[in-house]
Amino acid sequence: MKVFLTGASSGIGEALARHYAAQGATLGLFARREAELARIASALAPASIATYPGDVRDAAALARAGADFIARFGVPDVVVANAGISRGVLTGEAIDLPVFKDVFDTNVQGMVQTFQPFVAAMVEARRGTLVGVASVAGFRGLPGSGAYSASKAAATTYLESLRVELAGSGVAVVTICPGFIATPMTARNPYWMPFLLAPDKAARLVARAIDRRRRFYVLPWQMAWVGRLLKLLPRPLYDFAFRRAGRKPRQSA
C-alpha cells in the first residue's frame, strides 16, 4: 500500500503514519515541522518513507511533493488531507481577520491543494481513496470558533461534492469527522471534551473506515449520536444551550 499524508508531524497524522508503517505501507509524509518529520521517519525505520517539509497553504510545495511521490513510488492508494489548524476568533476584532484567512487557507484550500496533484493519476489508474479530515465541530457553529466550525463545514461539503464528482471513476472519497482527540491542538482547549480519544485509537478507527471506503465516518461512535442530536436541535434551543459554551482562546489577543 502507498499512502500520502499531510499533517503528519503530530496528532492523528503521526498516529496514522505509525499505523500504516506497521502494515508495511510506503509513506509520503508532508508537514511544516522538518525536525518532527525527521524524528518520525527515524522512529519508523526501516519503513519506506519520503518526507516533505512544507505548508499545505503552498500549492507549489504540494505539487512538487505529489510529483516526486508518484515518480518514486507510483500512484498512491490513499491520500489523506489531515493538516488543520484551530484558532479562537471574534468577528468584531480586526486583528482576527488574518486568523480567519489562515484557518480557511489551511483547512479548506489546503485540502484541495493536497488532492489536486494526485487526482488525474488516480482517475487514470481507476483506483485509490481520497480522505479528508473534517470535524464534528462543522455540524453546528460554535461560539468563538467561527473560523474553525465554518472551515470544517466547508470541508465536509467540498468532500461531498468531490465524492459525487468522482463517482464511477474508481476513486473513492472518504469524509472523516473526529470528535475530541488528545492532540497538541486540543490540549489548549479550556473546556470539557467528552469522549476524548487517544490518537492511536483514533488512527485505527480512521484506517478501518478508509479500508471500508466509508463515505462519511464520525468517531468515536458516541460523537456520531451527539452530532445527530445537535443537527436536530431547533435554532432557539441550540442558541440557548451553547451561548455560554467554553471558547477556544484567541491567539491574536
Task: List the predicted regions and their residue ranges.
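Rossmann-fold cofactor-recognition segment
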Residues: 44-60
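Conserved glycine-rich cofactor-binding loop
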Residues: 9-10
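Active-site helix of classical SDR
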Residues: 115, 151
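C-terminal helical subdomain
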Residues: 175, 191-226
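Conserved mid-core segment of classical short-chain dehydrogenase/reductases
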Residues: 86-101, 144
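Residue(s) in the substrate-gating loop at a strand-loop-helix junction
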Residues: 135
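Conserved glycine-rich Rossmann-like NAD(P)H-binding loop of the short-chain dehydrogenase/reductase
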Residues: 23-40
